[in-house]
Amino acid sequence: EGCDILLNREITSIDMDKLIVFCDKEKINGDLIISTISPDFLYKCCWGELAYVGRDFFKIVLPNEKVLPDDVYFIYYPNENEQQTRITECKKFTLHKSKNSLITMEVPSLKNKLYPTMIQSQLDLAEKYIKNLPEKIMSVGRMGTYRYVDIDDIIMQGLKFKEEL
């Protein structure tokens, strides 16, 4: 209530002093900007680009009612010798019933930006960007804060943030 939420827009630039967002050849003014994008984008990477790790997702349907044990939703493979990093049995999150199981296998990739690299120099750089944001620009979420945060924690952050506004 009292705000416009715009989805699926490509941001081309942001005037942080005037609180203007340019996207899809459109100029959007506001009195507050809540950003979920990487803070280096806001500053056009003036102090350097923040490093992220991505994932490629491979979907596999198996003719089994279940693949993983009942209380296991996903399995991590943190071993350097394993190419994939996680396998997830998707229907366990939705409680969907089926004689087949969809699993996803995640493989490290540089094609997209999903997870911040938890290297001190990168954390320091992110902190520099975030601390220099104008008072009326709030940076939230995994990319906005450059922290590895699970989706349930991000939702709780969003609800808390809404109450603080």
Per-segment meaning from a language model:
Residues 16, 27-29, 133:
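Flexible, charged surface loops at secondary-structure boundaries
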